[in-house]
Amino acid sequence: MKKIIFFTILYFSLFINSLNGHVQHYLNLNYLEYDLFLNNEKIGSHIFKFEKNGKNIKITSNGSFVVSKLGVKLMNYSTISEELYHDNQLVKFKSNTKQNDKVKYVILNIDKDKLNFDINGSSFNGKANSSTIVGNWWNHEIVKKNEQISPISGRIIKQNVNFLGKEVLKINEKKYTALHFHFLSNDNKPINKKK
């Protein structure tokens, strides 16, 4: 049975000038926060902070959410991560995540030839092509990729991304134009083998 990952990525016109392409297009962005909703109820948030120093960009993130039903916590998730880019190329990534009672991690470094990432993760140890993107949702380049590195465990996730169209959203009496995408994992592992 395929694991279905469904995300709606919204690019509000408010951010379009700052969020327009590769990492260098994020130079004017210092802070990005989004709330996470399930069935129209806020369950958590994710915050990204951007620090620039010459040709380096460091992105730190902190996120958490809780899914409960009838007062029982079904999912309790918290994560912190740090990404370092030099000349618009990811050179380091590390994360620590607690998902219910499981501790997960990723330590990623680019190799000396800048062709591959060396990944040490809780679910994967090995190499990935340096053009593969870490699946942190601040970088809209993810919609152009056919695979991502899990920021939770380091595993390589094959994905299909479909553009569903433009939508106009009304938030606090203000209208925003958004792009709607559907992400689907095309990983054929049985659900109990996925980490």
Each language-model region and where it sits:
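Ordered hydrophobic segments in well-structured contexts
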Residues: 33-35, 178-182, 195
